Swiss-Prot record:
Origin species: Arabidopsis thaliana (Mouse-ear cress)
Name of encoding gene: LECRK82
Higher taxonomy: Eukaryota, Viridiplantae, Streptophyta, Embryophyta, Tracheophyta
GO molecular function: ATP binding; carbohydrate binding; protein serine kinase activity; protein serine/threonine kinase activity
Family annotation (SMART domains): S_TKc
Name of the protein described by the UniProt record: L-type lectin-domain containing receptor kinase VIII.2
TM spans (from-to): 316-336
Length: 711
């Protein structure tokens, strides 16, 4: 029996739906499909860039990076118009947008400007610089607009409350409503990534704005404004961002953006129009057109807007007959074409079942040219699964990072795991996978190249000391990424290899967590299966080493190790220099050392001595988070969502016992770590070591068989 693809039934049912709607539908609110997109799916051709706006490694830059203070403006708009008002009912659409942005500065004393989310009727209009934010002209002329501004300079001309506020602008840059961002501890000029959610309820006529450092939406909005949006928009508008500088060196970046809008009917319908049908039943929200058919049949007295319904019964019968014939003919053609396709299509290995939304597929020739035939001079790192090269694409000149998997059998598993996971993930602090190549028996993964390399290189190899604000921003970003993987994805994702060499840094030192080769998906609230433990010593939780079961709390332990490493500038496990003629000494645990200082009331003496400036209270809070995440008992460790809330000041610092708790296992955590590490070191002459993703790291990745499992 021929098995038809699900797509056939989808198309077939859609045609029936269209025919039924054509005959008798009077519901005009469903004429326009929802608009949905995000920055990860947009290309250069799908954006309209004006002025100084440009794309840089997947980030929208509204202003350029200039060392000399200037006044410039830029605007980036989604290239297609979006329906914001129904042409017949004039009712406004509901919409939701989320974006992550930052305001950085080459000269902290040179401030002035800002950016705004804008709804504009004109895709080619760019307003004046300075406080006008590219929204309108100095003369006051310009196209009408609706905008939510984030302003970094107090301008008396525009009645600004201060130089750190959010405001709603309606056809003018004098805000109709404004809120002080200091009330929620947000500083636009800090350089930190700021997240904003803007929603508009078309039925309730209310616009709300939420702002937070965390990627978790706050409970309360900073702005909630009654707004008749239909008074300020036309039927179709353009959405995007506008920004400007005002004699400053500010750089306005949008790292992530998602948008959706629709004309969905609310649960509380507005008063019915004359001669309109009564409010629909609950089922109408699922199948509105069919519900409309039932309503019209049940109520013959209701008027019909469709001209076809006013024709004679014979005309209606003719249309129905023709429609039925067309559907039958369509079904027959599809069945014939699909049967021929099955007969002549060879069975071949495909990644379609593994990857639902694949990134771009590169050719081997492209990558060979990009790396100068994989020249050793292009090598920028060696990982547990292969070598990483710097590449330059010949067609666009774009600089990329190419990961060349070293072992085909092992690399194939790595390839499928990494591609199927990263290909569908969207978060500003996750390393973006541009594409892949699977030719000539090789597997290659293509990523955005991070100008500042990995975090471990920034900590240990850079000639300049990584300042504390950058370190704090990095820790917050990684925590945000892990909270997303653990609690915001459809299936929970356990990374299993969180370490400083897997954290990459972009041009603004924003962190990008990468290397998903060891990651695993599980359903939320479901116990994971035991597997062979894998990862890097010093970052592995003790219970994971014994049971082989990776949970979100094992990632939390790894994150705790990263926190302490970043704060102290020391690796999780270190070995003292051996005395001449003697066997090297045992390695020491960073967690034990920091906990000992905490017990003595000298926690801040553990801080990296290269750090000349930092906030002691802030440093103490972060280090306490590191200790809380490093507790031997996984039950007592916080979740990553809690960690984010603690770091941004939305939750209190957890209580950490003065003395490190004893492990519930038969031996202490440090004893377990040190013994295993020494065992790995002793085998180096027999077994080939597996290096970390950083060339400079002295630790070794391990692959340890779980309890009661054999090699």
């Amino acid at each position: 029996m021929l098995k038809l693809p699900p797509r056939f039934f989808s198309v077939y049912s859609t045609l029936i739906h269209i025919l039924a709607s054509f005959l008798c539908s009077s519901d005009v609110r469903g004429d326009f499909p929802a608009t949905r997109f995000d920055l990860g799916t947009l290309t250069l051709s799908s954006l309209k860039l004006l002025g100084d706006a440009h794309l840089n490694n997947g980030t929208i830059k509204l202003t350029r990076e200039l060392s000399v203070p200037t006044s410039t403006a830029g605007k980036a708009l989604y290239g297609k118009p979006v329906k914001f008002r129904h042409p017949e009912t004039k009712s406004p659409a509901s919409f939701t947008t989320y974006f992550s942005f930052s305001v950085t500065n080459l000269n902290p004393s040179s401030i002035g400007g800002g950016l705004a989310f804008v709804i504009s009727p004109d895709e080619d209009y760019l307003g004046s610089t300075g406080g006008f934010l590219g929204l309108t002209e100095e003369t006051g002329s310009g196209s009408g607009f609706v905008a939510v501004e984030f302003d970094t300079l107090m301008d008396v001309q525009f009645k600004d409350v201060n130089g750190n506020h959010v405001g709603l602008d309606l056809n003018a840059v004098v805000s109709a409503a404004v809120a002080d961002l200091g009330n929620v501890d947000i500083d636009l000029k800090s350089g930190n990534a700021v997240n904003s959610w803007i929603t508009y309820d078309g039925s309730g006529r209310v616009l709300t704005v939420y702002v937070s450092y965390s990627n978790l939406k706050p409970k309360s909005p900073i702005l909630s404004v009654p707004l008749d949006l239909d008074r300020y928009v036309s039927d179709s508008m353009f959405v995007g961002f506008s920004g400007s500088t005002q004699g400053s060196t500010e750089i306005h970046s949008v790292d992530w953006w998602s948008f959706s809008s629709s004309f969905e009917e609310s649960s509380e319908s507005p008063p019915p129009m004359p001669n309109s049908p009564p409010p629909s039943s609950p089922s109408s929200s699922i199948t509105p057109s069919l519900s409309t058919v039932r309503r019209k049949t049940a109520d013959p007295s209701s008027s019909c807007r469709n001209k076809l319904c006013k024709k004679s019964p014979a005309a209606v019968a003719g249309v129905v007959t023709a429609g039925a014939f067309f559907l039958a003919l369509f079904a027959g053609v599809i069945i014939w074409v699909y049967s021929k396709k099955i007969k002549y299509t060879r069975k071949s290995e495909s990644l379609a079942s593994e990857i639902m939304k694949s990134p771009r597929e590169f050719t081997y020739k492209e990558l060979k040219l990009a790396t100068d035939c994989f020249s050793s001079s292009r090598v920028i790192g060696n990982g547990a699964f292969g070598t990483v090269y710097k590449g330059i694409l010949q067609d666009s000149g774009e600089i990329i990072a190419i990961k060349r998997c070293s072992h085909i059998s092992q690399g194939n598993t790595e390839f499928l795991s990494e591609l199927s996971l990263i290909g569908t993930l969207r978060h500003r602090n996750l390393l973006r996978l541009q594409g892949y190549c699977r030719e000539k028996g090789e597997i290659l993964l293509i990523y955005d190249l991070m100008p500042n390399g990995s975090l471990d290189k920034a900590l240990y190899e850079s000639p300049t000391t990584l300042p504390w604000p950058h370190r704090r921003k990095i820790l917050l970003g990684v925590a945000s990424a892990l909270a997303y993987l653990h609690q915001e994805c459809e299936n929970q994702i356990i990374h299993r290899d969180v370490k400083t060499s897997n954290i990459m840094l972009d041009a603004n030192f924003n962190p990008k967590l990468g290397d998903f080769g060891l990651a695993r998906q599980t359903e939320h609230d479901k116990s994971p299966d035991a597997t062979a433990a894998a990862g890097t010593m010093g970052y592995l939780a003790p219970e994971y080493l014994l049971t082989g079961r990776a949970t979100e709390k094992t990632d939390v332990f790894s994150y705790g190790a990263v926190v302490l490493e970043v704060c102290t500038g020391r690796r999780p496990i270190t070995r003292p220099e051996p005395e001449p003629g003697l066997r090297p000494g045992l390695r020491s645990s960073l967690v034990d050392w920091v906990w000992g200082l905490y017990r003595e009331g000298k926690l801040l003496t553990a801080v990296d001595e290269r750090l000349s400036e930092f906030n002691p209270e802030e440093m103490s809070r972060v280090m306490m988070v590191g200790l809380a995440c490093s507790q031997p008992d996984p039950v007592t460790r916080p979740t990553m969502r809690s960690v984010v809330q603690i770091l941004v000041g939305e939750a209190d610092v957890p209580e950490v016992p003065i003395a490190k708790p004893s492990s519930s296992m038969s031996f202490s955590t440090s004893e377990l770590l040190l013994t295993l590490q020494d065992s790995v070191s002793d085998c180096n002459e027999v077994l080939a070591p597996i290096s970390t993703t950083s060339c400079s790291s002295s630790e070794h990745d391990i692959f340890i068989v779980g309890k009661d499992r054999s090699v």
